Amino acid sequence: MFKREYKFNFKSFLIWTVITLGIFLLVYLMYPSIVASDNVKMIDEMMKVFPPEMLKAFNMDIASMNSAYGWLKSEGFVFVLLIIGCYAGILGSNILLKEENDKTIEYLNSLPIKRTTIVLNKVLVGLINITLLVLLLGIFNYIGLTISGDFDIKQFILLSITPLFPALVLFFTCLFISTFTHKTKKTLGISLGIVLISYILQTLSTIAEPVEFLKYFSAFTLADIRHVIVDVSINPLMVIITILLSISLFLLTIFNYNKKELV
């Protein structure tokens, strides 16, 4: 069953990977010409116009835009978090539900396979695909940055790991939500909404101090990129919270799926 599931999801994984790497390839091809011209000075001057809170939200107050690595630490990781977050959310909402949507659940029910086993195999495929996307993007960025110029390797490796934390929570959240419906069309919009709202909450909590508490309702807070940039270390608390939330949502998914009336 694992091979069947992995083969079924490989095409979408490949498409997401190619598109993601293509976006960053364009950046690495274009950025040398940008930093070699007067555009850098214009960008630096433009940065002075923005309020400190806005710069802080995108880490532009602690990362210079005069290099590809500086861009990656600021605007670049916005793309990284959103792309991987959207992929994880969509995968979580579809991977378990597609059997009902495609009317193949009857075939699985005819096999001597427990529902818990079905969930375990699908979750394993999801975790492998998400981890591979994070890993491949990290390797690609490493090659791109090596060609572009000097950068802090340890800091980069830690930064490359951080998108995995919100992605796992988003995956398990959308997986759990999918156990309440029978159609993938319903969960697709919900999963994308969760990802975007989660990112907006995290951004607002950084920009405005009165709503700083909103970060506790966002999965992207778990990435804690600013902490990695400043201290060159991953906050252990974020790792613990990610594990606890993922396990809790996983167990709830199994419980709900075993009770669900499959159609």
Which residue ranges define each predicted feature?
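Aromatic- and glycine-rich beta-strand/loop motifs that create alpha-glucan
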Residues: 1-21
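Terminal transmembrane helical anchor/hairpin motif
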Residues: 9, 26-69, 180, 193-263
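Secretory targeting signals
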Residues: 70, 120-179
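Long, hydrophobic alpha-helical segments
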Residues: 72-95, 192
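Transmembrane helix boundary and interhelical loop/hinge segments in multi-pass membrane proteins
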Residues: 89-109
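A structural motif at transmembrane helix-loop-helix junctions in multipass membrane proteins
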Residues: 164-196, 204
